[in-house]
């Protein structure tokens, strides 16, 4: 059997220029890896070759008869084509030469180690597993190439080296899936070109709006990312009418199923929040919101040019691979406009999102030494920045402390950054010098100080995806809270649209705060001003939705029946009416110090 000395001898004879050329592509990531192809069945080999080369994987065809058959079928062979006819020892020698050149290693063990860790490959055996082929495949395993075959493999492969974190040999793999399994076993990061689109796609378009008079289709609904099993990479399912048929307002749902060796449930919300950034780079598309409060507005001009829901799925598939190929290897997307299907996704999403929200348990800000920033929404509000702690989730409600921590573990240099709490300035309002410094840097100077716990002094900013607005009501010495679904006027004399203009541009406004619903269930919600005790008015639907959360807080502090002390549009339309209601219910705000 071939050994490491044989491979190094072959490396000395390898074409230096070709090894350097391909080696550079390995190192810069433009070539994700290589495959060693064994077998003689040309009919089976051709679609595999097409799949490998389409994904920029270099193929070494290592059997002479297969080389001849492929050439006779009209397929170009050679270094430029990425399908290279070499014997197994010469192919491994070429990889060894790349390791020597770019890894600056020469000892056999060092060359083998560099090849396994940095030059990732796998062996494909199409056809009969003869002793000679198995011997060649076992030699390739030294370089980090597991064997995959469409046929069952003999028991002898069970004795092969199993010290790596990938399987050494896998038999009985479906030919349609064999390349994907190889990619997953060795963790190759495939770069996908942007699909052909009828519209322009560039970050230059992020932040654009699609007003009513130019909107061809306005979709509202839910988006969900889950870790899936037995999914097909690149499959795009459209269930229901497409946007060329759907006019005006329409419900919609999108289910994105992800799998990969490094994928885990904690990463799901991180990927979920990337949908907005990916879609907003398309000319004529405006995406706002997350979870079950998504709005997707598509301009009529984009529809007229031929844009369809399938294009959105294709863009999402490619960009998720390109941005997060280090954790995922398969992305399957289903888009629904059929109402019966949408309801099923909504129910599934609600259950999953509730479980995600429970992960933090009783973790408090005082229990951790690191907070996180999130600048994901700066494409729609340039100066905006979220500071995320266990008791201070992002204003969108979709990114909490665990999500941000997971995002940093995936992409250390990305939309989220870790900030160590240092230089406490004021514990009551929640200010630290290190947090202020991070806020100044990442907001481009728009935010000079950031209070996590105060409504009145240096409150945080908001973008366009916040769920609620809290605003001071001076006469009642309290605050009102409304959510985006409320269309009526508030006791402040402003409706949601007016309040949105005040808080939704990325600049902090004392006395006004855009935030998530989840924030109201924490002990740190405007705690500098007294917290939940300050709430004197809410729109009725929001009050009832958050009743369990607010009752739990109030009961724990010895204020039973607190939620019914909060006025709504059903009994109070002005601040004067609120004040009378507070006196009738003996609201605790009457005993509190003035906010101003």
Q: What label would you give each PLM region?
A:
Residues 42-61, 136-140:
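Histidine-anchored nucleotide/phosphate-binding helix
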Residues 1-29, 105-106:
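Short N-terminal or domain-adjacent regulatory/targeting segments
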Residues 32-33, 113-126, 148:
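Extended, intrinsically disordered, low-complexity regulatory segments of metazoan chromatin-modifying
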Residues 3-17, 151-596:
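Cysteine-centered metal-binding/redox modules
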Residues 33-45:
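Short, glycine-rich nucleotide/cofactor-binding loops
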Residues 57-69, 79-86, 148-151:
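Short internal beta-strands
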Residues 69-104:
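Long, charge-dense
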Residues 1, 22-35, 54-55, 119-121:
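A short, charged/proline- and glycine-enriched loop
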């Amino acid at each position: 059997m071939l050994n490491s000395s044989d491979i190094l001898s072959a490396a000395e004879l390898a074409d230096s220029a070709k090894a350097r050329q391909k080696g550079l592509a390995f190192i810069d990531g433009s070539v994700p890896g290589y495959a060693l192809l064994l077998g003689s069945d040309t009919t089976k080999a051709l679609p595999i070759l097409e799949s490998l080369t389409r994904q920029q994987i270099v193929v070494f065809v290592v059997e002479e008869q297969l080389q001849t058959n492929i050439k006779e079928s009209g397929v170009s062979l050679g270094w430029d084509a990425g399908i290279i006819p070499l014997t197994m020892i010469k192919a491994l020698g070429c990889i060894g030469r790349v390791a020597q050149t770019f890894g600056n290693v020469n000892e056999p063990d060092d060359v083998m180690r560099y090849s396994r860790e940095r030059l990732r490959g796998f062996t494909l055996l199409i056809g009969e597993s003869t002793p000679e082929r198995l011997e060649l495949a076992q030699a390739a395993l030294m370089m980090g190439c597991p064997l995959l075959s469409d046929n069952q493999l003999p028991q002898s492969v069970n004795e092969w080296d199993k010290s790596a974190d990938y399987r050494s040999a896998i038999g009985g793999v479906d030919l349609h899936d064999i390349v994907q399994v190889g990619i997953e076993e060795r963790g190759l990061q495939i770069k996908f070109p942007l699909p052909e689109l009828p519209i322009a796609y560039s970050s230059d378009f992020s932040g654009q709006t699609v007003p009513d008079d130019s909107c061809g289709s306005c979709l509202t609904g839910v988006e969900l990312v889950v870790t899936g099993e037995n999914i097909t990479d690149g499959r795009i399912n459209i269930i229901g009418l497409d946007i060329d048929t759907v006019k005006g307002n329409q419900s919609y749902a999108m289910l994105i199923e992800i799998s990969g060796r490094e994928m885990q449930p904690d990463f799901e919300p991180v990927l979920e929040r990337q949908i907005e950034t990916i879609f907003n780079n398309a000319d004529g598309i405006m995406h706002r919101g997350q979870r079950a409060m998504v709005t997707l507005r598509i301009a009529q001009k984009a529809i007229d040019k031929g844009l369809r829901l399938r294009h959105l799925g294709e863009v999402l598939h490619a960009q998720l691979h390109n941005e997060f190929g280090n954790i995922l290897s398969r992305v399957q997307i289903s888009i629904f406009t059929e109402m019966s299907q949408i309801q099923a996704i909504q129910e599934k999403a609600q259950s999953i999102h509730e479980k995600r929200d429970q992960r933090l348990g009783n973790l408090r800000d005082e229990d951790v030494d690191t907070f996180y920033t999130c600048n994901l929404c700066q494409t729609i509000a340039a100066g905006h920045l979220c500071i995320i702690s266990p008791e201070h989730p992002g204003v969108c409600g979709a990114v909490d402390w665990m999500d941000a921590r997971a995002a940093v573990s995936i992409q250390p240099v990305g939309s989220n950054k870790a900030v160590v709490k240092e230089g406490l300035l004021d514990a009551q309002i929640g200010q630290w010098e290190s947090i202020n410094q991070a806020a100044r840097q990442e907001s481009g100077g728009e935010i000079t100080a950031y209070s996590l716990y105060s409504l009145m002094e240096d409150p945080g900013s908001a973008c366009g995806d916040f769920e609620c607005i809290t605003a001071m009501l001076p006469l009642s010495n309290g605050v009102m809270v409304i959510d985006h679904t409320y269309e009526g006027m508030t006791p402040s004399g402003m409706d949601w649209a007016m309040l949105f203009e005040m808080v939704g541009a990325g600049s902090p406004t004392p006395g006004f705060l855009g935030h998530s619903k989840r924030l109201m269930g924490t002990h740190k919600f405007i705690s500098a001003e007294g917290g939940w005790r300050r709430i004197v008015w809410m729109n009725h639907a929001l009050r009832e939705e958050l009743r369990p959360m607010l009752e739990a807080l109030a009961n724990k502090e010895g204020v039973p029946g607190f939620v019914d002390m909060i006025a709504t549009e059903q009994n109070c339309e002005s601040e004067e009416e609120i004040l009378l209601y507070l006196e009738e219910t003996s609201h605790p705000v009457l005993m509190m110090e003035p906010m101003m």
